[in-house]
A protein has these predicted regions:
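Non-catalytic, conserved peripheral segments adjacent to functional cores
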Residues: 7-119, 138-140, 147-196
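Ligand-binding loop in jelly-roll beta-barrel domains
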Residues: 128-144
Length: 196
């Protein structure tokens, strides 16, 4: 096989896109190429992403590092400051959750749970109109994500991670959860700011 053929093979169908049970939320699974040096995969390609998911203008990449039991969320930004996110884990393992806050959606109030890890290399796309959070399942996790809107502290909001109406089955004893004081003040789902 010549170099051109090899490159065409590598760049063809290098990401699997699967829409979840909630419309607009997608799981992306890359095709990973392993050899004696390690591995290579294409983490994001604008043209392929837009062909499957649609046009999203990502403007910033963020990264966080957390230890086992850390639960961040459930976060969102209100109104025109709402954010779409493409999230992934580059070290460790997390359980990632997106909650549908779109009142007009047939899945309003429902949630999606996806395990993201350095091993499965999956990504989760969460459109605007959702609350988002994750729980660290490994001793340590490095979590990175793209966003399509600026961080706007005056417009940020959160919902309690253990809200009974949402009913997320986090695989951890509540006493082992590590969260921020701000997240402890999250609203009940019924009092959240919803999207149309």
């Amino acid at each position: 096989m010549n170099l051109l053929s090899l490159w065409q093979n590598i760049t063809k169908d290098n990401m699997e896109y699967e829409e979840t049970d909630i419309k607009g939320v997608w799981v992306l699974t890359p095709k990973v190429f392993n050899d004696n040096r390690g591995y290579f995969f294409e983490a994001w390609k604008k043209s392929d992403f837009e062909a499957h998911v649609g046009k999203v203008d990502f403007i910033q990449d963020n990264e966080s590092k957390s230890s086992y039991g850390v639960l961040r969320g459930l976060h969102y930004q209100k109104g025109t400051y709402s954010q779409a996110k493409l999230v992934r884990v580059i070290k460790g393992k997390v359980l990632d959750v997106a909650v549908d806050l779109r009142k007009s959606s047939p899945t309003f109030g429902k949630h999606v749970m996806v395990e993201l890890s350095e091993d499965n290399k999956r990504q989760l796309f969460i459109p605007r109109g959702f609350a988002h959070g994750f729980l660290v399942l490994s001793p340590e996790a490095i979590f990175t994500y793209k966003i399509d809107n600026i961080y706007a502290p005056a417009h940020e909001a959160s919902i309690r991670w253990n809200d009974p109406q949402i009913g997320i089955n986090w695989p951890i004893d509540q006493k082992d959860v590590v969260t921020s004081p701000k997240d402890l003040e999250g609203k009940d789902f019924k009092d959240a700011d919803f999207f149309e």
